[in-house]
């Protein structure tokens, strides 16, 4: 039987059949006609006609099915509700980033895409990304937030389980993708390939992408040129923490921890913190030990670091002030990097605390010094024994 003849038979039962059948997908398979209904009502309508009014020989030619809906992809958004646009403290150094994100939320995917926010540690990048996610979620959008490192780990797990398509579909089904700590894509080639394809899919679908990193895309060593090019294809916004904004944050954080807004405490925090993480860390210590207790603890820690410097200066027969200066002769340079290394290993001081003790603007010099010592220890057995000896001596004498 031809399809037209079959449709005429159905029309003879119901005059509206031709219009209704336009909603069906009709396939011919193995001598049968498969009618795929768009929903339950249409399926029941056609089944009633077929089973009640058509002859047995015609019924055998017809199969009716309901269209299978694609399973909705379940999304774990990894958002923390404590981060909102309302409690993000705006100042001169972060105003542009804040305004760009707010505007993008009004026109997801069509105004600024991608948005790449960069700035040093503890300047509020994560807060802003999370706040954007929470705001978009509140408006009914599908959102996912992840750090680059978590993205890589999840991808590896899905590859092991054989569920990589589930992973891809989850990321490709969102309206807003927030990727934090983009610098951790560095050197992860397989992860970069996966993210590149997800990025392209979302971009072509005009879905919003917001990225954050501790450095400009051009400084992302170990990240492919084609990804860097995508990152630079939207809007780049630097985020900083100026003194006025830090002052506002300190006051808000003190209120948050129910601490008195004493001038000496605020002045101390302004003098001894550079970013939000440091502010929160110090305030937690003030809450725990009291302001005077914190001052005593930090004075003790600073004294230990200076004792390490003096110990190394004596061993190398150089001046303490030379170690703390920018002098670059071989003896002083070696003493300086070993002193930094011992401050980290013996006193467990933070990179920022060591940088401050050695009068450095940031902690990159400290990182370089520690890595240099560790690399030289691997190559030179004599140097390794020397560092081990100094470490033991420093620990016994100072800690």
Curated annotation (Swiss-Prot):
Stretches for region Domain IV, binds dsDNA: 291-399
Main location: cytoplasm
Disulfide bridge partners, by residue number: none
An example Gene Ontology CC term for this record: cytoplasm
Region Domain II: start-end pairs: 64-77
Binding site for ADP: 89, 94, 122-127
Family: Belongs to the DnaA family.
Entry's Gene Ontology molecular function annotations: ATP binding; ATP hydrolysis activity; DNA replication origin binding; identical protein binding; lipid binding
Domain text: Domain I is involved in oligomerization and binding regulators, domain II is flexibile and of varying length in different bacteria, domain III forms the AAA+ region, while domain IV binds dsDNA. An ATP-specific conformational change within the AAA+ domain accommodates and stabilizes subunit-subunit interactions necessary to support oligomer formation. ADP-binding does not allow oligomerization. Probably binds dsDNA via flexible domain IV.
PANTHER family according to UniProt: CHROMOSOMAL REPLICATION INITIATOR PROTEIN DNAA
Pfam families listed in its UniProt record: Bac_DnaA (PF00308), Bac_DnaA_C (PF08299)
Gene3D superfamilies: 1.10.1750.10, 1.10.8.60, P-loop containing nucleotide triphosphate hydrolases
Superkingdom classification of source: Bacteria
Binding, ssDNA: 156, 188, 190-191
Binding site for ATP: 89, 122, 124-127, 180, 277
GO biological process: DNA replication; DNA replication initiation; regulation of DNA replication
Species of the source: Aquifex aeolicus (strain VF5)
Positions of the UniProt region annotated as Domain III, AAA+ region: 78-290
List of residues binding Mg(2+): 126, 181
The name this protein goes by in its record: Chromosomal replication initiator protein DnaA
Lineage: Bacteria, Pseudomonadati, Aquificota, Aquificia, Aquificales
Ranges for region Domain I, interacts with DnaA modulators: 1-64
Keywords: ATP-binding, Cytoplasm, DNA replication, DNA-binding, Lipid-binding, Nucleotide-binding
Assembly and binders: In the presence of ATP analog AMP-PCP forms a linear, right-handed spiral filament with 4 subunits arranged head-to-tail, about 122 Angstroms wide and about 360 Angstroms long. Mg(2+)-AMP-PCP binds at the subunit interface with the gamma phosphate coordinated by adjacent subunits. dsDNA probably wraps on the outside of the filament. ssDNA binds to the center of the helical filament via the AAA+ domain, which stretches the DNA.
Record bears the keyword Mitochondrion: no
């Amino acid at each position: 039987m031809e399809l037209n003849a079959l449709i005429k038979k159905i029309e003879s039962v119901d005059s509206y059949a031709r219009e209704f059948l336009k909603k069906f997908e009709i396939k011919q398979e193995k001598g049968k006609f498969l009618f795929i209904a768009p929903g339950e009502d249409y399926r029941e309508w056609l089944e009633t006609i077929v089973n009640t009014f058509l002859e047995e020989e015609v019924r055998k030619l017809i199969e009716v099915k309901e269209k299978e809906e694609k399973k909705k992809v379940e999304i774990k958004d990894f958002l923390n509700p404590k981060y909102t646009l309302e409690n993000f403290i705006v100042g001169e150094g972060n105003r542009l980033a804040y305004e760009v994100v707010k505007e993008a939320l009004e026109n997801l995917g069509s105004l600024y895409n991608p948005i790449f926010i960069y700035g040093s540690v503890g300047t509020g990048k994560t807060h802003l990304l999370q706040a954007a996610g929470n705001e978009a979620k509140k408006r009914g959008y599908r959102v996912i937030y992840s750090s680059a490192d978590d993205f890589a780990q999840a991808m590896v797990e899905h590859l092991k389980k054989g569920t990589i398509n589930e992973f891809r579909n989850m990321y490709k089904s969102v309206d807003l993708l927030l990727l934090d700590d983009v610098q951790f894509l560095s050197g992860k080639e397989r992860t970069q390939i996966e993210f590149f394809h997800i990025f392209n899919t979302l971009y072509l679908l005009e879905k919003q992408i917001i990225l954050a990193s501790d450095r400009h895309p051009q400084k992302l060593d170990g990240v492919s040129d084609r990804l860097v090019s995508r990152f630079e294809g939207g809007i780049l916004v630097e985020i900083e923490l100026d003194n006025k904004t830090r002052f506002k944050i300190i006051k808000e954080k003190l209120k948050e921890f129910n601490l008195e807004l004493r001038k000496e405490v605020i002045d101390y925090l302004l003098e001894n913190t550079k970013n939000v993480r440091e502010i929160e860390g110090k305030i937690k210590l003030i809450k725990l030990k009291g302001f005077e207790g914190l001052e005593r603890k930090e004075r003790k820690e600073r004294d230990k670091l200076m004792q390490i410097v003096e110990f190394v200066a004596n061993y190398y027969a150089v001046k303490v002030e030379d170690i703390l200066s920018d002098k670059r002769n071989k003896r002083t340079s070696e003493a300086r990097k070993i002193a930094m290394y011992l401050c980290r290993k013996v006193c467990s001081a933070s990179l920022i605390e060591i940088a401050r003790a050695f009068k450095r603007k940031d902690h990159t010099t400290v990182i370089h010094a520690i890595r240099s010592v560790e690399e030289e220890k691997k190559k030179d057995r004599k140097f390794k024994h020397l560092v081990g000896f100094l470490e033991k001596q420093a620990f016994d004498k100072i800690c």
